[in-house]
Design a protein with these regions (language model features):
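Phosphate/pyrophosphate-binding loops at sites that engage ATP/ADP/AMP, CoA/4′-phosphopantetheine
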Residues: 1-12, 178-193, 244-245
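Short beta-strand-loop/turn "lid" adjacent to the catalytic site in phosphate-handling enzymes
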Residues: 10-22
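Short, high-confidence coil segments that cap the C-terminus of an alpha-helix
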Residues: 11, 70-71, 194, 250
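Short beta-strand segments
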Residues: 17, 48, 73-79, 105, ...
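Claisen-condensing/thiolase-fold acyl-transfer catalytic domains that form or cleave C-C bonds
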Residues: 20-22, 34, 39-41, 47-66, ...
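Glycine-rich loop at the start of a catalytic domain that most often binds anionic cofactors/ligands
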Residues: 27-30
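Flexible, glycine-rich active-site loops centered on histidine and acidic residues
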Residues: 66-100
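Condensing-enzyme catalytic core mediating Claisen C-C bond formation in acyl metabolism
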Residues: 89-170, 174, 178, 270-305
């Protein structure tokens, strides 16, 4: 906000996309609203989605602005995927990374391309899942210390999610290439005219397979962002954008994301005049409470002290 000279009172809508909130309730958007000191007339809400989450956030923010309900929106997206993964699990620990992003969208009088194609196949809801900890299967004494090893010796616990890798790969190869073709056609573009294809960085092999099957220009579809920053889930596609050179020509950009749900989304957007803040390392605030201090804080809260 400081880099774009935005005041807290300027924000009209706050959307927060994540899957691993600070607390089961309240939503992180309300917490962020208070931390940022936004005005009380600024509605704030969470969206619980993973790898397709950034595109879903853009879609809803764009729809709210296009409808005239608000003239701008601050879209926050972030998850701690690596922190939530058992680091001894070689199947998962080497895949995920932590990241957060902030995107400010506002209405302009100038016509700009902003086309979306969204979808969901709920029959695959259990292909990527964190089965414990919700109201259907709350943690209890039997599950909190649960530890299971798969055939490869990877340890899985109730505190982490799981994925049916082969099923998710097949889903990706079925959905992503056709999704790219559909969004290009919906925007009225030609694939060779697109400046950047920001494809969800599930892993390098998957991105390369999607590029090949979709027959899009490989030089315009980065695959090395996964190698640099891992799979950032909700932030994966925007990491591709932020990793571009400051002077990159990104007038015609396509975001293509797919994952948990099973869900997917793509957007074709004109990013002329975009301010790209790049990528930086997160530095935690020095006054943040550690785990022991937080526990003590809530004990006092329960006691009414």
């Amino acid at each position: 906000m400081s880099e774009m000279s935005l005041a807290a009172g300027d924000i009209e809508l706050l959307i927060f996309v994540n899957q691993k909130p600070d607390f089961p309730e309240p939503c992180d958007a309300c917490i962020a609203h208070g931390e940022l000191g936004l005005r009380k007339s600024c509605p704030s809400l969470d969206i619980n989605l993973g790898c397709s989450g950034y595109v879903h956030g853009l879609w809803i923010a764009h729809a709210m602005i296009a409808s005239g309900a608000v003239s701008n929106c601050l879209l926050l997206v972030g998850d701690l995927c690596a922190r939530a993964t058992d680091q001894t699990n070689r199947k998962a620990a080497q895949v995920f990374g932590d990241a957060a992003s902030a995107t400010f969208l506002k209405r302009t009088e100038e016509e700009r391309t902003a086309t979306f194609v969204m979808g969901c196949d709920g029959s695959g809801w259990d292909k990527i899942i964190h089965p414990f900890g919700g109201m259907r299967l709350p943690y209890d004494a039997a599950s909190i210390d649960l530890s299971v090893e798969d055939a490869a010796g990877n340890r899985w616990t109730a505190q982490q999610g799981m994925m049916k890798g082969e099923d998710v790969f097949n889903f990706t190869m079925e959905v992503a290439p056709s999704l790219l073709a559909e969004i290009i056609a919906a925007a009225g573009w030609k694939k060779e005219d697109v400046d950047l294809f920001a494809i969800h960085q599930a892993n390098k092999q998957i991105v390369e397979n999607v590029i090949e099957k979709a027959e899009i220009p490989a030089e315009k579809a980065p695959t090395d962002v996964f190698s640099k920053y891992a799979n950032n889930s909700t932030n994966s596609v925007v990491m591709v954008l932020c990793d571009q050179p400051e002077n990159a020509e990104l007038k015609k950009t396509i975001f293509c994301a797919f994952g948990i749900g099973l869900s997917w989304g793509a957007t074709a957007v004109d990013l002329t005049g975009l301010y790209n803040g790049g990528i930086s390392t997160y530095v935690p605030p020095v006054n943040r409470m550690n785990r022991e201090q937080q526990i003590e804080h809530w004990i006092k809260h329960f006691k009414g002290e």
